[in-house]
Amino acid sequence: MASLFASLGRSLIKLLIVLPVIIGLSISSPAMAAQWDAETLTVPAGSGGQQVTFTESEIKSASKLFKSNCATCHNQGVTKTNQNVGLDLEALSLASPARDNVDGLVEFLKNPMSYDGEYSIADTHPGISSSDVYVQMRTLNDEDLRLIAGYILTAEKVQGDQWGGGKIYF
């Protein structure tokens, strides 16, 4: 009889350990799926109102590209060297020219310009045309840049104010 109670006790302990994990997975899965709906994955392609929809797979690849090429200075969409200029959609839309679209961001990554668009910052900001600053950027091709732009433009939709929101969210 004692061994029966010991066996039941071990089974109950195992169930109490596994059950919260199962419940947690069943609760979090729909939320994870919801963040990748078509609306979230659709962003402005250019300044003319055209739209482009990325796939979940493209954004996951883009996330890796961003983390390995951009996150050193732009972790969570904050600009380490100038926290007044983040990668949130509002800041991108107020840049000149606007960078709140794929074409605008790709052009910036190829030829970095000041926030007001007045002069090149290729000497201080990594980009395809940068000379000695973070030369790893020069290995990125147009498709890589397109994916990184898509990631930046979808990140705020997924992460909310934590993307580009500054250190109050960390």
Swiss-Prot record:
Pfam families: Cytochrom_C550 (PF14495). One of its GO terms (cellular component) is plasma membrane-derived thylakoid membrane. The keyword Thylakoid applies. Its main location: membrane. Its cofactor is heme c. One of its GO terms (molecular function) is iron ion binding. Binds 1 heme c group covalently per subunit. GO terms for biological process: photosynthesis, light reaction; respiratory electron transport chain. It comes from the Bacteria. Heme c binds at C70, C73, H74, H125. It is found in: Cellular thylakoid membrane. PSII is composed of 1 copy each of membrane proteins PsbA, PsbB, PsbC, PsbD, PsbE, PsbF, PsbH, PsbI, PsbJ, PsbK, PsbL, PsbM, PsbT, PsbX, PsbY, Psb30/Ycf12, peripheral proteins PsbO, CyanoQ (PsbQ), PsbU, PsbV and a large number of cofactors. It forms dimeric complexes. One of the extrinsic, lumenal subunits of photosystem II (PSII). PSII is a light-driven water plastoquinone oxidoreductase, using light energy to abstract electrons from H(2)O, generating a proton gradient subsequently used for ATP formation. The extrinsic proteins stabilize the structure of photosystem II oxygen-evolving complex (OEC), the ion environment of oxygen evolution and protect the OEC against heat-induced inactivation. Low-potential cytochrome c that plays a role in the OEC of PSII. HAMAP family: PSII_Cyt550. This is Photosystem II extrinsic protein V. It comes from Prochlorococcus marinus (strain MIT 9313). The lineage of its organism: Bacteria, Bacillati, Cyanobacteriota, Cyanophyceae, Synechococcales.
